Design a protein with these regions (language model features):
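Glycine-rich phosphate-binding/hydrolytic loop that grips phosphoryl groups
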Residues: 106, 158-190
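Generic structural signal for residues in well-ordered beta-strands
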Residues: 150-155
Length: 190
């Protein structure tokens, strides 16, 4: 199972009896990166250090997770702006940046976890790809929830012969080659 954490988080896997499953799970790095640009004069939270230094507002995160998107089954898709309105929430804006970032990281992790919980079976391995794999706070939340099933970092990529940083670029090249060859580029459940 692959969780790709870019601006939008998405997951793809192959389930016995179901076939290929792929869908957007919710925010990836978008909300955290946008918050950093707006309020911290930085492009992103390097290694998730600011988020890790704060205290997440679990109650706020749970109210955000009540949004219909998180309970809707797959396939489903969204754009990086879909949850941008969360950055205007006064409950977030009144927090110090570390606590705001901690809350955004928990929201992102819990939205990913909610999507995994919708699967027919819990994946034995969850490979983390994309820039979000460098956010140690985000990874910590996922590891706390799914334990050793969560695999992040270059070791996984090297072992599987793909680059976790280049997953989307490699996928686009693969899909382009299939399109040129007149082959399908999608599956019914994606």
């Amino acid at each position: 199972w692959v969780a790709n954490l870019t601006g939008v988080a998405n997951q793809t896997g192959i389930e016995s009896g179901t076939g290929v499953i792929g869908f957007d799970t919710g925010p990836g790095n978008a909300l955290m990166d946008d918050y950093m640009r707006l309020y911290c004069d930085a492009d992103f939270d390097k290694d998730g250090a600011l988020a890790a230094s704060g205290i997440a507002d679990a109650t706020l995160v749970e109210t955000w997770l009540d949004e219909r998107y998180f309970t809707t089954g797959w396939p489903k898709s969204l754009d990086r702006q879909a949850f941008r309105h969360r950055l205007d929430d006064t409950r977030l804006l009144t927090k110090v940046p570390a606590d705001a970032m901690a809350s955004l990281a928990l929201f992102t992790a819990n939205s990913i976890a909610a999507a995994i919980d919708q699967l027919p079976a819990s994946p034995k391995t969850i490979l983390i790809a994309g820039g979000g794999r460098r956010n140690l706070c985000l990874l910590s939340h996922l590891q706390n929830r799914f334990g050793s099933a969560v695999q992040g970092g270059n070791i996984v990529g090297d072992r599987l012969l793909f680059s976790p940083d280049m997953l989307e670029a490699e996928l686009m090249a693969f899909l382009a080659a299939r399109h040129i060859a007149g082959l399908p580029t999608s599956f019914p459940a994606t």
